[in-house]
Regions:
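Accessory nucleic-acid engagement/destabilization modules that flank
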Residues: 1-19
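N-proximal short alpha-helices
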Residues: 15-19, 23-24, 47, 207-208
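Short, flexible helical or helix-coil boundary motifs
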Residues: 18, 22, 127, 131, ...
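Conserved adenine-nucleotide phosphate-binding loops and their immediately adjacent elements
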Residues: 20-43, 63
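Conserved helicase motor core of SF1/SF2 NTP-dependent helicases
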Residues: 40, 45, 51-128, 150, ...
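Conserved P-loop NTPase mechanochemical-coupling segment
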Residues: 122-149
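Mid-core helix/loop region of P-loop NTP-binding domains shared across ATPases and GTPases
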Residues: 141-169
Length: 388
C-alpha cells in the first residue's frame, strides 16, 4: 500500500529489539525503608492498647522479646503519667538508651529521664548543693571503699529519699532485666508512696546480657507482648533462633534477605562496610542516621574504630563513635552499649568468638537491632554458622 508509512518488517523488528526490551525498575532502599516504617507504625499502634488495659493497675511488669515495642510503650506510659500530673521518673540501666530516652522526652513537664547511675550521680551533686550533705561520703562512711557503682551509688540514692523534694509519684523502668537486684530498693524508696506508688517495669527475659537476677518488686504475673513490630520476618527469624522464652509472633513484612559481607581481616571488613555504606548513601539515597555499625565482640573495638576513622564517607555524612546519632551521623558502637536501641540498617561485625555459643545472647540482641536491613560481616565460615 503506497499510503502505508510503517517501517519495513526488518527495521520494525530491529526497533523492537533495541527499544522495547523488557526491564525492571527496583525501588531505592530509602523508599523501601519508608514503606516498612509505615507498616511498623500500624503494628505499634496495636500494642498501645495494652497501656489502656493496665491503666488502672498501680504496678505492672510487661515482658516481650526484641522488637515487641517495649521501649515505645515505656515512653508512652511515662508521658501519660506525667500528663496526668504525676511527677514521673523514666529510667533504665544502659547509658546509651538513657541518653536516647532523654532526647525524645525533652521538654515534657513532670517527667525526668535518667539512666540509673546518672540518676545517682546527679542526685549526689544536687543533694550536696541544696541540702549541704555529701551522700557519697555518707555511703563510704557506712560501707567502706566498696564498688562505687554497685554499692555506694545505690546507697547514696536511697539516702536522697530522706527529702520529699527528691521523690517521685511514679516510676517507669525500661530494660528492667539489666537492673541489679540491689538497685530496686533505692528506686522504690524514691516513690513518695513506697507501698502503692505506680511502678511499671518493661523487660525481656532473653536480653539479660549482664547476667542479672530478675526479681522485680512486682508480685503479679507479667503481661506478655506477643507481636514483633520492629523487624522484618527475615530478621525476626534469625534473631529468634537465639531466643529462649514465650512465642513471639513474627511480622508479616518479609523484607530483604540477610546480607553477607565476607572478609577475613578486620581491615578488609571495615573497607567493605565503608564501600557499602557509601553505596547506600549515594546511590540508594539512604539517610546516614539510618545506618549503624555494631560490634558483636567489643574486644577489638579500638582497632575497628581507628580503621573506620581513616576512611572517608560521602559528605555531609560523618562517623559518630559511641555517642548519640545525629541526622548526618553513621554510628559505630558495640552491641552491649547499643542495647535497647534500633536502627533501620545494621552492619553486625566483630563476629569472632561467636561459634561456641558464648555470644548467643549478644547475637540475639545485635541482629534484632536492625529494623529493615541486616548485614553480617566477617569470615564466611562464621557468617554461615550464624545463619545455619
Amino acid at each position: 500500500n503506497e499510503n502505508d508509512t510503517s517501517p519495513p518488517d526488518g527495521i520494525l523488528s530491529l526497533l523492537q529489539r533495541t527499544f522495547a526490551r523488557s526491564f525492571e525498575v527496583h525501588p531505592l532502599v530509602s523508599q523501601k525503608l519508608v514503606q516498612q516504617k509505615q507498616q511498623r507504625l500500624r503494628l505499634t499502634n496495636n500494642q498501645m492498647r495494652l497501656l489502656d488495659y493496665i491503666n488502672n493497675r498501680r504496678r505492672a511488669a510487661i515482658s516481650g522479646g526484641a522488637g515487641t515495642g517495649k521501649t515505645l510503650l515505656a515512653v508512652e506510659k511515662a508521658k501519660r503519667l506525667a500528663n496526668d500530673g504525676f511527677k514521673t521518673l523514666l529510667t533504665c540501666y544502659n547509658k546509651q538508651l538513657g541518653m536516647h530516652l532523654e532526647s525524645i522526652c525533652k521538654g515534657i513537664d513532670n517527667l525526668e529521664v535518667k539512666n540509673f547511675h546518672y540518676l545517682c550521680s546527679s542526685y549526689i551533686q544536687k543533694f550536696k548543693k541544696e541540702m549541704n550533705r555529701d551522700l557519697l561520703q555518707e555511703a563510704k562512711d557506712s560501707y567502706g571503699m566498696q564498688n562505687q557503682f554497685d554499692v555506694l551509688y545505690p546507697v547514696a540514692l536511697s539516702y536522697a529519699a530522706d527529702s520529699s523534694n527528691f521523690q517521685f509519684d511514679a516510676i517507669v523502668c525500661d530494660e528492667g532485666q539489666d537492673v541489679k537486684q540491689s538497685y530496686w530498693e533505692p528506686l522504690e524508696l524514691l516513690l513518695n508512696d513506697y507501698d502503692n506508688g505506680p511502678l511499671y517495669v518493661f523487660f525481656d527475659d532473653n536480653q539479660n546480657i549482664y547476667s542479672r537476677e530478675k526479681k522485680f518488686p512486682i508480685t503479679e504475673e507479667p503481661f506478655l507482648l506477643k507481636d514483633n513490630c520492629r523487624n522484618t520476618s527475615q530478621i525476626h527469624n534469625l534473631a529468634y533462633k537465639y531466643y529462649k522464652g514465650d512465642w513471639i509472633d513474627p511480622p508479616q513484612n518479609m523484607g530483604a534477605k540477610i546480607m553477607r559481607i565476607h572478609a577475613d581481616t578486620l581491615e578488609s571488613q571495615v573497607k567493605k562496610i565503608n564501600m557499602e555504606i557509601t553505596n547506600l548513601i549515594t546511590k540508594e539515597k539512604v539517610s546516614p542516621d539510618s545506618i549503624s555499625v555494631l560490634l558483636l565482640n567489643g574486644e577489638y573495638k579500638e582497632i575497628y574504630y581507628n580503621i573506620f576513622e581513616g576512611l572517608p564517607l560521602p559528605k555531609p555524612a560523618k562517623l559518630q563513635i559511641e555517642w548519640i546519632q545525629g541526622v548526618n551521623d553513621v554510628l559505630i558502637d558495640t552491641v552491649k552499649r547499643y542495647k535497647g536501641l534500633e536502627s533501620e540498617i545494621v552492619f553486625l561485625c566483630g563476629l569472632d568468638g561467636s561459634e561456641n555459643g558464648a555470644l548467643d545472647d549478644l547475637i540475639y540482641v545485635g541482629t534484632s537491632r536492625a529494623k529493615s536491613l541486616l548485614y553480617l560481616v566477617g569470615k564466611e565460615r562464621i557468617c554461615n554458622n550464624i545463619l545455619s
